[in-house]
Amino acid sequence: PQGSGQGQGGQSQADQSQGLQRQLEELTLVFSALFGPVRLTDLITPHRLSGSVKLPGQGSVASIWSKALKELLTQQLSGHVVVDLRSAEYGAMYRPTRGSDCLLLNIGVAKVNPATGKRSVVSHWAKHTRGLLAGALLRAVAGGQLAASDGDVDEILQVAAGLEGVKEVEITPLDARGQAKVTLVL
């Protein structure tokens, strides 16, 4: 039916919002030190446990999860490009095995001090900037500008470079485990 376009515009936004929600639910894993990797729709009890906590005779929580998740996640992530927004503490819970065909892009954030010109890692802005990147990537997938199943590294880096405040994006060569460090320079 013909209309003024106002309702159609609203419907389009609603469809985009639903598409974004679907992508968020399907593509996002959150790492919990207590429960391991969980989906956003998983119901879990409120808790406080750090991955660095050491359990008597067993090592750190992160090392316990690392052993438990190594094979499972390596199989599940096989053939995929993973944008890893975890902090170092949670990053220790899973790393791809050597020879894995999963490509893991570990996202870091650095800021240049205008007075000295020196770069430093900024944990204060890292979580915020990683959140902006997650939102931008999910919108790109929901909008059809980025493939979810076989994401192209160059396209992911372009999305990162387009974030407000990002002045430069750097990537290291892949290591033997299929990991590369991507640094967003603010």
Regions found by a protein language model. Give the residues of each.
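Internal, well-folded beta-alpha domain core
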Residues: S4, S12-L186
